[in-house]
Regions:
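Short acidic/polar N-terminal linker immediately downstream of export determinants
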Residues: 4, 16-70, 87-103, 119-120, ...
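Short acidic-glycine loop/turn motifs at beta-strand connectors
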Residues: 78-79
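Solvent-exposed adhesion/ligand-recognition segments of exported proteins
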Residues: 73-75
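Sec-dependent signal peptide hydrophobic core
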Residues: 2-9
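Generic short beta-strand segments
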Residues: 85-88, 201
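Extended, compositionally simple hydrophobic/Ser/Thr-rich segments
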Residues: 33-34, 40-53, 100-102, 106-238
Length: 238
């Protein structure tokens, strides 16, 4: 009797695990679907998605994926933040990477996580500050123009960034990397930790810190007061 009960328990637990981790394999028929969203200034992406962001006069969201996977890709807007994510407990195996194309007149904050990528299809300009966050081995290629730009990376994420700003604030931790020589900033504040790397251009001043086995490389004629500790480094590049 005990053996039967134990066997039944194993079957039950195994079944629960299978349900909790349902796997959906792409059909191979990739299509594009329009989703309804408007009135947002912030974007929050998670779940191994390739995101293409464009500044345009009209708001739109298009999702490209296998036809049997589209239903598991959620798009919601609460009036200020557009959220795009894959359903919990569903393991998707798309034929190709899931792609999302976003157009909007204005962007203030973009958060990307879970091995997702973000690409700017044109230069994103703003009269206000722009805040970018990447985590969980995410990747970015950014083109921004705003009075203040903040970029924060964690968890082995990396991004390249170009454009123009007066004040740049950048942090990288957990073996992350910011490549920002092509972002023309006047003032820069940086924080590199945990074997991370930051590259930045600054024409007036640059401050902050570099710790652990991290490095900060900068171009421009900025006065530097970046503090370093441990095996970290701070270097001016030509």
């Amino acid at each position: 009797m005990k053996k039967i009960a134990l066997f039944s328990l194993i079957i039950l637990v195994g079944g629960c695990r299978e349900i909790a981790g349902e796997r959906v394999k792409g059909s191979g028929h990739v299509i594009t679907e329009n989703r309804t969203a408007s009135g947002f200034n912030n974007v929050d992406i998670s779940g191994a998605i390739d995101v293409y962001v464009k500044q345009d006069s009209v708001s739109s969201v298009k999702v490209e994926a296998d036809d049997n996977i589209l239903e598991y890709i959620q798009v919601h807007s609460d009036g200020s933040t557009l959220e795009i994510y894959t359903e919990n407990n569903i393991r998707l195996k798309p034929t190709n990477k899931i792609k999302v194309y976003i157009s909007n007149p204005q962007y203030k904050e973009i958060q990307v996580s879970g091995a997702s990528t973000i690409r700017c299809e044109n230069e994103i300009t703003s009269a206000d500050a722009i805040d970018i966050g990447l985590s969980g081995a995410s990747d970015g290629r950014l083109e921004l123009n705003a009075p203040k730009i903040s970029v924060h990376l964690t968890g082995a994420s990396n991004t390249s960034i170009k454009g123009k700003t007066k004040d740049f604030e950048g942090s990288a931790s957990g073996a992350s990397e910011i490549r920002g020589f092509d972002l023309l900033s006047e003032n820069a504040n940086v924080d590199a930790s945990g074997a991370s790397h930051i590259e930045i251009f600054a024409s007036v001043k640059i401050d902050g810190q570099s710790s652990g086995a991290s490095s900060v490389n900068y171009k421009g004629n900025a006065q530097s007061s970046v503090e370093k500790s441990g095996a970290s480094s701070v270097n001016k590049k030509d």
